[in-house]
């Protein structure tokens, strides 16, 4: 009985025809025999919905990242995949951002528009971007900061534009903002509204370098840990300008025209660790360094300092600082290194951390 069953199974297999590779022409012949023409089949295929989001022409899409950089685009591409989390449009020729350019991009976290020709952004252009965290608009032709930026924004970079005004209203409600980069713009001190940055409660980093400002912007938020104002036209550091910056750890004021630092200025930054005052017009070491508990790095090279006192950097006698210096630079000043008492740097961590050199 078993043998009979096996024989029948083998016979059934042997009756089956061999596998044949079939092409589009074979299916078209079948359609012709069944009364379905090739045109009907083509229309049927065209009517099918796409299986997933379509990548814009010439762009590259991978893992919710849409890269459309370096394509010579003059506008934002249409029909961007709605699940996009990062959109890269840098190095194009886009001149304007319009309402609706980013519709349906509710999952976008980062938008890169660097190095375009953008001079206009419609007030509601970024409204659909309810999850946007990073907005990069550097190297464009913007004269003002964009309005109605998403409240989720954490990082804004708009250096190398044509911005002349920073209004307080632009940053209202941006409570998640951490980084603001405004360098290399034709900004003047009068163009920054008093307290423009005050409303951003989490703001940690501001860079306004290589502009025309002559004073430290007033009303900076107490949350700041880094303030970079290098390459400006600041002439003086007064105590009021640093008041309330209790969390500031790094202050960059290199390449300005600062001739004086008011007494008490550094006392307003009790947690300062790095102070960059090189390439200015200082005639003496700023007061208050010896009493500062945490400061570790002080750059004073390329100034007009002609004398250094034995207590300018360290507490009197051999009282120890909370933190020892790890870097002190005084080279390219009129003061001669042999005129400085060895005990002046008694609170420096290692001697190699001191850079004196000669004045040229």
UniProtKB/Swiss-Prot annotation:
Pfam families: LRR_8, LRRNT. The keyword Isomerase does not apply. Residues 17-30 form a propeptide. SMART domains: LRR_BAC, LRR_TYP, LRRNT. InterPro entries: Leu-rich_rpt, Leu-rich_rpt_typical-subtyp, LRR_dom_sf, LRRNT, SLRP, SLRP_I_decor/aspor/byglycan. Its main location: secreted. GO terms for molecular function: extracellular matrix binding; glycosaminoglycan binding. It is found in: Secreted, Extracellular space, Extracellular matrix; Secreted. The attached glycosaminoglycan chain can be either chondroitin sulfate or dermatan sulfate depending upon the tissue of origin. One of its GO terms (cellular component) is extracellular space. Residues 1-16 form the signal peptide. It comes from the Eukaryota. Keywords: Disulfide bond, Extracellular matrix, Glycoprotein, Leucine-rich repeat, Proteoglycan, Repeat, Secreted, Signal. Disulfide bonds join 55-61, 59-68, 314-347. Glycans are attached at residues 34, 212, 263, 304. Belongs to the small leucine-rich proteoglycan (SLRP) family. SLRP class I subfamily. Binds to type I and type II collagen, fibronectin and TGF-beta. Forms a ternary complex with MFAP2 and ELN. Interacts with DPT. May affect the rate of fibrils formation. This is Decorin. It comes from Equus caballus. The lineage of its organism: Eukaryota, Metazoa, Chordata, Craniata, Vertebrata. The gene is DCN.
């Amino acid at each position: 009985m078993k043998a009979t069953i096996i024989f029948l199974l083998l016979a059934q297999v042997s009756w089956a025809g061999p596998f044949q590779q079939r092409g589009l022409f074979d299916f078209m012949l079948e359609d012709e025999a069944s009364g379905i023409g090739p045109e009907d089949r083509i229309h049927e295929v065209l009517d099918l919905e796409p299986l997933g989001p379509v990548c814009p022409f010439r762009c590259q899409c991978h893992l919710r990242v849409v890269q459309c950089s370096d394509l010579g685009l003059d506008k934002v591409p249409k029909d961007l995949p709605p699940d996009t989390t990062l959109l890269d449009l840098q190095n194009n020729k886009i001149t304007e951002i319009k309402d609706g350019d980013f519709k349906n991009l509710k999952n976008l976290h980062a938008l890169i528009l660097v190095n375009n020709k953008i001079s206009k952004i419609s007030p509601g252009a970024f409204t659909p971007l309810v999850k946007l965290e990073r907005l990069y608009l550097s190297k464009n032709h913007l004269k003002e900061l964009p309005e109605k930026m998403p409240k989720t924004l954490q990082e804004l970079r708009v250096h190398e534009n044509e911005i002349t005004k920073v209004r307080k209203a632009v940053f209202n409600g941006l409570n998640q903002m951490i980084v603001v980069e405004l360098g290399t713009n034709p900004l003047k001190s009068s163009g920054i509204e008093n307290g423009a940055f005050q409303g951003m409660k989490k703001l940690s980093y501001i860079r306004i370098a290589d502009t025309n400002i002559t004073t430290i912007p007033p009303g900076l938020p107490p949350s700041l840990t880094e303030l970079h104002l290098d390459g400006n036209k600041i002439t003086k550091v007064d105590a009021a300008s640093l008041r309330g910056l209790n969390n500031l750890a790094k202050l960059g004021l290199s390449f300005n025209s600062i001739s004086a630092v008011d007494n008490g200025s550094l006392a307003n930054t009790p947690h300062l660790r790095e102070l960059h005052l090189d390439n200015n017009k200082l005639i003496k070491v700023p007061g208050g360094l010896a009493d500062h508990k945490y400061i570790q790095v002080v750059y004073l090279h390329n100034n007009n300092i002609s004398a250094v006192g034995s207590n300018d950097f360290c507490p009197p006698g051999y009282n120890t600082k909370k933190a020892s210096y790890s870097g002190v630079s005084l080279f390219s000043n009129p003061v001669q290194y042999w005129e400085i008492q060895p005990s002046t740097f008694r609170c420096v961590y290692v001697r190699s951390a001191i850079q004196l050199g000669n004045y040229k």
